[in-house]
């Protein structure tokens, strides 16, 4: 079931102004069709020698995973112009949801399993991105969920190589190094202190 939970501001790069977008929880067939119809052709048209790192992600399978395990998974997305602008799947419990950060070892956290913005919002895929801020809005939604679950804003995730700078520099997460138990991807955490700072810095 898909439910709109908030109106959020997205920066329209073409107009140079903020516009209203919908933050939703859950997913429906229309959203899955939107991703398939709108995202996939752009991914398919990308240079084969340099495909987007997340082009192979199957959001229908992720939706099914969330529907079958509602206590462990949550899906969130952002919609504007009747198109899906970004999607995120988070994990609320299980082996991935324990901190490795020295500030609070083994403390519970929200694990961001998958986070993707629509291809037309990515500078690497288009010379004129449509919206800015989709990834940050989804990430802050995960932080809010972490607070709601009484995890003090703590977040953990493994980053694709192309997104490492975003998590390290834009969100000021702690780079915990490469995880040889997880496809050698770098593992990042947002500690309790970092979550507090990120929330305080939010415009």
Per-segment meaning from a language model:
Residues 1-129, 137, 144-154, 162-203:
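Non-catalytic substrate-recognition and accessory regions of acyl/acetyltransferase enzymes
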């Amino acid at each position: 079931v898909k439910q709109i939970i908030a109106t959020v501001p997205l920066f329209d790069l073409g107009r140079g102004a903020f516009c209203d977008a919908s933050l939703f929880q859950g997913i429906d067939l229309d959203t899955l069709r939107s991703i398939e119809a709108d995202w996939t052709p752009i991914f398919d048209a990308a240079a084969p020698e340099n495909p987007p790192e997340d082009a192979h992600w199957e959001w229908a399978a992720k939706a099914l995973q969330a529907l079958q395990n509602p206590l462990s998974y949550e899906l969130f997305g952002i919609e504007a112009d009747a198109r899906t602008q970004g999607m995120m799947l988070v994990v609320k419990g299980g082996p991935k949801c324990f901190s490795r950060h020295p500030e609070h070892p083994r403390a519970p956290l929200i694990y961001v399993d998958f986070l993707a913005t629509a291809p037309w919002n990515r500078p690497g895929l288009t010379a004129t991105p449509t919206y800015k801020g989709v990834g940050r809005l989804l990430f802050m939604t995960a932080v809010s969920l972490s607070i709601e679950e009484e995890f003090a804003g703590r977040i953990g995730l493994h980053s694709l190589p192309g997104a490492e700078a975003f998590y390290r520099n834009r969100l000021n997460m702690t780079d915990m190094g490469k995880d040889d138990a997880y496809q050698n991807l770098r593992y990042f955490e947002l500690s309790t202190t970092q979550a507090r700072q990120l929330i305080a810095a939010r415009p």
